[in-house]
Amino acid sequence: MQYNFKVESFEGPLDLLLHLIHRYEIDIYNIPVAEITEQYLSYIHTMKELQLDVASEYLVMAATLLQIKSKMLLPKQEEDVHDSGEDFIDDPRQELMERLIEYKKYKQVAAELKEREQERAQLYTRPPIDFTSFQQEEAANLPLDVTLYDMLAAFQKMMRRKKSKRPVTARITRQEIPIEQRMTDILQKLETLGGRQSFYDLFADEEREVMVVTFLAILELMKHQQIVIEQEQNFDEIFLSCANHNSK
């Protein structure tokens, strides 16, 4: 069975690269191209495996990374001497680095504008009340924002776990389950368990095809805001909860 699924929340290859740089605490001014290329291609492979609609710009960036990687492997040659008299070594990463820095600035400005818009929406004609202490305490306890890239990383990790635990002689039974049915199953399971469950526990004892459908169902539930995804810190376990429970 084919599951064609388009994820509109992906913002593009630069967004994915920034996610990887943040996730693995990479210096944006000194990008380890081999490492970042491997991680990037791994995400693309997972997206294709899940039959997500991967835009051509992702593939163009993959080709760009591979080209930069190959240039980095070549012996470095001294280029023309600048007016200052200093030798200049051309860095194949320079253009990509500049694009990432500019995109990061754009994202920061966009986030600030959104925050100001939200603050503006909370203004009333009544005298102002100082909520500073409450807001600081609340912010300290807020979980991280979980992106679709975080979900892909969690799915990759889970698939590796399953592969390492699966017996060599295991036979996969093909099961065809509609995504809509799996969405209903997940919501019912969350309700039964008090509205919250670990991401990995949802995939217990499932075969590969069912795992794929389960993951796509989770993405659909996220898109329709029927579930909330939480993660306390980077690389921590991800938890799912029903949106109606979370709002209570």
Swiss-Prot record:
GO cellular component labels: cytoplasm
Subcellular location: Cytoplasm
InterPro entries for the chain: ScpA, ScpA-like_C
UniProt cross-references to Pfam families, sorted A to Z: SMC_ScpA (PF02616)
Single biological process term from Gene Ontology: chromosome segregation
Similarity section: Belongs to the ScpA family.
Database matches in PANTHER family: SEGREGATION AND CONDENSATION PROTEIN A
Protein name listed in UniProt: Segregation and condensation protein A
Taxonomic source organism: Bacillus cytotoxicus (strain DSM 22905 / CIP 110041 / 391-98 / NVH 391-98)
